[in-house]
Amino acid sequence: KPNSSSDSIKKRGGLPKWSLAIMWFVATVVLVFGCYGAIRLYNYYYNIGVSISVSPKDNIKKLDSMQTQNGSSSVVLKTDSVLGVALNIYELHNVKAELTLVEPDTADHSVLMYTRTADYTAMGKYIGSLVVDGEQKRSDVSRLGYCAIAKGNMVIGISRFDDMCEHMVARDGSYFRQFVLVSNGELPQRFFLHGKVERKALARTADDRLCIIATRHPETLWDFADALREYGYVDAIYLTGGNESGFYRAPDGTPYFTEKAAKYRTDKHHGVAPWLVLRKR
């Protein structure tokens, strides 16, 4: 005779079919959302629309191993044109780079050039990660291009990761982020700035030299970036301000400081703007 009490215990111990169905449904939903989140995270940090020429880790090694060059310091201006875009190309020779929130004195003859770098809002909030002499002012990886400065040396790169930013905080270096214009010889799929204005960029050549390039006339960001790519620059990041701010001293000592740049010194946000300063070593 079947043991009725044992059968009753087994029936009570089993889960109803509807309970199992709910558990499978919940597990499936969790798995789907987990995969979706993982894919989005991967696309955000890795699938950024352009290939990368130098990883942040390699740039860290390069920056840490840089040695002071021999020879005099100078910024040499050359002019050229490509794809109908007229360019001023500032070649940097053995300069000492720094990032500062104080616009330099143009009477200081050690200053060879300076220009604006990162953007900020009308309320003075920086857009993109910013580190000045080891002090982190802002953490924001929305912009893919970056520039890192340590011991007067400078590198640029393209990455969503902030490894280099953290390294600059630890090493009392400086760092800012900006829009990417060219990455590994490729243009990004789209640009977020529209209209025609005078443009400026910090770019790296195929033989690993850094230059600052400015347009001589108002250009769209796409036309400017395409001209940089066509000219042969491997990587390039945007510099805000164009020719409306900044200063340049020619090798013969002649200073160039436009009326627009002079007017900018009285801007209400003076003291907030981060400046890339290039000095004699």
Regions found by a protein language model. Give the residues of each.
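Conserved, well-ordered active-site substructure
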Residues: 124-141, 192-195, 204, 208-235, ...
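Short hydrophobic/aromatic beta-strand or adjacent loop that forms the aromatic wall/cage
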Residues: 85-87, 144, 199, 271-275
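Beta-strand-turn-beta hairpins that frame and shape the catalytic cleft
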Residues: 85-87, 152-153, 205-211
